[in-house]
Amino acid sequence: MKKIIIFVVLVLGAVYFFSNKYFYKPPVLRIGSECDYIPNSWEENFQSDSNIPVTNHKDYYAEGYDIQIANLVAKELGMTPSVVKLKWEDLIEALLRREIDVIFSSMLDTEERKRLIDFSIPYELKKTEYAVMVRKDGKFADIKKLEDLYQARILSQKGTYFEDAIEQIPGAVKATPVITVSDMIEELDNGKVDGIVIDVDTGTTYEKMDDDLKLITFPEGEGFIVGFSGVCAGVRKNDRRLLERIDTAISKITPRMRQRVMDQVISKVWHNNPNP
């Protein structure tokens, strides 16, 4: 009888061990992202060794700086990353409705947003700076300061800090905001506006992709004044433990690692030529 009991215990132990080792599925981290903001996030219709499936867009995969930072965070947390593509203006609402667990979408921790959700420490490569993008053949192609954009028709993305930034351009005409950065670029390309407000990193990427566009940056103290810490991950206010774990994971991503991620992402932009 004793031998039978020992045998049963050994069998049960073996079953438990192998079931955990071979059948354990780590929890999923549902990442909300706009997937329309090269080089930070976009989607592509092929799988690679680095992109992440978009759960609500069949046969599409998310890629970009935001996505790869989120991937590193998920791995540090022992979770499987999955991306949910959302319109920019729907990201916070989806988070509050628990449709996603975290936002990784180049979101800035503005005071208005901090009243709704909590933010991680910044994960950007360098401090976010704003610039103006114009057409090379346009009448504002040679401006040197914000004041030179007097009476220029300037466009922004709806629901972003780009909208507020236009208010800092004396005498500028504020065009009706559009939904995505791609929409901004299209409006500018088609000559419907004189310029757009965009962050330097994204603007630099689009400038290299479109020979008709020119990115204009401003010396420190002469450009846009921004009221935020930087690009951060967003979580619900009651998810304090998750926020602490995300902060710890982000803190382990060194500046050199962040630069390597960005370099790899930029390389993929040129080689894969995604169509955002």
Language model segments and positions:
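Extracytoplasmic small-molecule ligand-binding "clamshell" domains
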Residues: 24-107, 115, 174-177
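Short amphipathic alpha-helical coupling segments at ligand-binding clamshell hinges
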Residues: 69, 145, 199, 237-252, ...
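Short, hydrophobic alpha-helical packing/hinge segments within bilobed ligand-binding/sensory domains
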Residues: 69-70, 90-94, 100, 183-187, ...
